[in-house]
């Protein structure tokens, strides 16, 4: 099983350990991006969520709702 490099959320150090940072004891995260899929089965939902968040933060986009 290949090991993945992990980064500490607290101090930013990189490690191969899986549970806690050996330097500060903080939580670890995988710093790699998610895999890309051309089919993108959840793209429709992600775009809908982005549109709703944008509308709540800045109002509806120009040209919509007029």
Curated annotation (Swiss-Prot):
Keyword Cell membrane among record annotations: no
UniProt-listed InterPro entries: H/ACA_rnp_Nop10, H/ACA_rnp_Nop10_sf, Nop10_arc-typ
Keywords: Ribonucleoprotein, Ribosome biogenesis, rRNA processing
Gene3D superfamilies (UniProt xref): H/ACA ribonucleoprotein complex, subunit Nop10 (2.20.28.40)
GO cellular component, one term: ribonucleoprotein complex
Sample GO molecular function, one term: snoRNA binding
One annotated GO biological process: pseudouridine synthesis
Domain of life: Archaea
Pfam families tied to this protein: Nop10p (PF04135)
Family: Belongs to the NOP10 family.
Annotated function: Involved in ribosome biogenesis; more specifically in 18S rRNA pseudouridylation and in cleavage of pre-rRNA.
Protein name: Ribosome biogenesis protein Nop10
Organism this protein belongs to: Methanopyrus kandleri (strain AV19 / DSM 6324 / JCM 9639 / NBRC 100938)
Gene symbol of the encoding locus: nop10
